[in-house]
């Protein structure tokens, strides 16, 4: 495949570029706040984390779409999935707004948008790769954000680095959550092509309940504890202090300082 069609097909939308700009603005405010907890600190980290998470949702869905495009589903281009426009990834409130709200309230990287792909002609291996491409974006972002925090952490700019660490932690939670073999999630999507047809048909109706299954997982104490033990097991490889993550989460939920 030559470079020209690739450049023509992948066109970041102005909305995605705006999300990047807002993320950078939040980071700048958090950087200016230095190591002092003040209103500017809360505003900066909140913008950095929420806009940064929205950007990661776009990259996650773009990963699915771009991989499918490489395997022959060129309909993703006409549907706008290669523009990274968050409004193209299904319903803006339920698919994007709800995960952002959950981030703000609970600090969990909840699955976001979805792209509709034509994969029926693909091999089982290709279908699995398409499913895993989204979580791969979260993995890359987690390594990048936590790696930068580990390498360049400076107490003089603790507010900024706590926001970056928390955003990196959210990528880890999203990675683990998406890889669970629950119908409707990417982990099951990677496994499904290798199941026999009878099993696929039996589990197909459960896909519509994937959201509810995840909610049950997160509100059941024993399952919630198991989930976060797994998340922190992966997170600990980064060498970043969990204190930074906690501080970043508290700054993101700025209202917690008063209520």
Curated annotation (Swiss-Prot):
Disrupted-gene phenotype: Not essential. No effect on degradation of PbpB (PBP3, FtsI) upon depletion experiments. No effect on processing of anti-sigma factors RskA, RslA and RsmA.
Cofactor note: Binds 1 zinc ion per subunit.
Keywords, alphabetical: Cell membrane, Hydrolase, Membrane, Metal-binding, Metalloprotease, Protease, Transmembrane, Transmembrane helix, Virulence, Zinc
Disulfide-bond pairs as recorded: none
Gene Ontology terms for molecular function: metal ion binding; metallopeptidase activity
Xref: InterPro entries: Metallopeptidase_M50B, S2P-M50-like
Record keyword Transmembrane present: yes
Topology within the bilayer: Multi-pass membrane protein
Residues the entry annotates as binding Zn(2+): 60, 64
Top-tier EC class: hydrolase
TM regions (residue ranges): 14-34, 39-59, 96-116, 129-149, 159-179, 203-223
EC number: 3.4.24.-
Location (main, coarse): membrane
Family to which the UniProt record says this protein belongs: Belongs to the peptidase M50B family.
UniProt-recorded name of the protein: Putative zinc metalloprotease Rip2
Taxonomic placement: Bacteria, Bacillati, Actinomycetota, Actinomycetes, Mycobacteriales
Primary gene name: rip2
